[in-house]
Amino acid sequence: MLRIPANIRPVGFPSVAETLPKAVERIAQALKPEKIILFGSYAYGNPTPDSDVDLLVVMETNKPRKEHVVDVSLLLYPRLFPVDILVKTPEEIEEALKKRDFFIREIVTKGQVLYERPK
């Protein structure tokens, strides 16, 4: 299910509000992730003209993480705004939360789920 928050507004890159939903849909269709989570300034409602879009893609994979980051990155073209991509498996997320990883915990608790695969 695709959910784009209303607070994504044209700040610095007018195309984010228009382009992000299409990009998330392409990632969801091609890679079948468990979740796509928006985090950082766009998710927290305080983007600046220099802000990038931060995405965490949670998916099962046997490929090296760098390969999946490239796979996701290619699905974002044409890229009209800067994007930072993290790809993690559900197990990596679970392990990070057990270890009290602040960064992952913040993404999971404060981030906005843009897509969640139906169960």
Residue ranges and their predicted role:
Residues 56-58:
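Short hydrophobic/aromatic beta-strand micro-patches
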Residues 1-35, 44-49, 60-119:
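Catalytic core of pol beta-like nucleotidyltransferases
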Residues 51-53:
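Short, conserved active-site loops that position catalytic residues or coordinate cofactors/metal ions
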Residues 41:
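Conserved H-loop
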